[in-house]
């Protein structure tokens, strides 16, 4: 009986850890520097990605390096990475290659959308509804599906290799991902609070697990 109860408890715990949750109006809060505080997201992926759009909001006053979105596979830790450097530049990595953008800086919550397509390699970064000059990388590449997706830390190993000096301190929310490139009109609609049925990560039906000191709190942006 005790073994049966223990098994049921484990099953319930795992079920709760990755249950779908509507996160509208909420944000993940990372209140202090840590090498073991992060959120792991579970994606719906059935085939290699040849395009993507990732959108999210971040509120932080950090002036150092930090990771906004980290998607790693066992063969490539920077399969997808959105990273802010200490010189106020933002880099997008795909398959270990990266391009750099330098958008405006703001003390307000910032909205980011990054897109990439394999056919041309065209890579875009949108900040608060405004596009940066397009770049190109990893033309013809396909992204692996057996992924570890982490918020709050950069992965220097699959689901690990975290460094305290690259962690996020602040809030992150409205995280959505599609397996195609959204149009400029769609990106601006997402920036304004709309959505287009995200089919990889959906903030309205998010599967996640928090580790360390991370909290779910009401969002601080409209």
From Swiss-Prot:
Keywords: Acute phase, Calcium, Disulfide bond, Metal-binding, Pyrrolidone carboxylic acid, Secreted, Signal. This is C-reactive protein. Ca(2+) 1 binds at residues 78, 154-156. GO terms for biological process: acute-phase response; innate immune response; regulation of interleukin-8 production. Displays several functions associated with host defense: it promotes agglutination, bacterial capsular swelling, phagocytosis and complement fixation through its calcium-dependent binding to phosphorylcholine. Can interact with DNA and histones and may scavenge nuclear material released from damaged circulating cells. InterPro entries: ConA-like_dom_sf (IPR013320), Pentaxin_CS (IPR030476), Pentraxin-related (IPR001759), Pentraxin_domain (IPR051005). Its cofactor is Ca(2+). Disulfide bonds join 55-113. The keyword Secreted applies.
């Amino acid at each position: 009986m005790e073994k049966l109860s223990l098994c049921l408890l484990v099953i319930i715990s795992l079920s709760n850890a990755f249950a779908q949750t509507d996160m509208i109006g909420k944000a993940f809060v990372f209140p202090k520097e840590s090498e073991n505080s992060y959120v792991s997201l579970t994606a719906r992926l059935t085939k290699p990605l040849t395009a993507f759009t990732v959108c999210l909001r971040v509120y932080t006053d950090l002036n150092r390096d930090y990771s906004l979105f980290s998607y790693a596979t066992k063969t490539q830790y920077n399969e997808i990475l959105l990273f802010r450097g200490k010189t106020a530049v933002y880099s997008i990595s795909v398959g270990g290659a990266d391009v750099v953008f330098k958008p405006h800086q703001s003390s307000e919550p910032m909205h980011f959308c990054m897109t990439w397509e394999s056919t041309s390699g065209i890579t875009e970064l949108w900040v608060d509804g405004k596009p940066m000059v397009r770049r190109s990388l990893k033309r013809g590449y396909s992204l692996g599906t057996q992924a570890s997706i982490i918020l709050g830390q950069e992965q220097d190993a699959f689901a690990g290799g975290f460094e305290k000096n690259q962690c996020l301190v602040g809030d992150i929310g409205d995280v959505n991902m599609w397996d195609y490139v959204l149009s400029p009109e769609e990106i601006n609609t997402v920036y304004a609070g709309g959505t287009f049925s995200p089919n990889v990560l959906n903030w309205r039906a998010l599967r996640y697990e928090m580790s360390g000191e991370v909290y779910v709190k009401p969002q601080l942006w409209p």
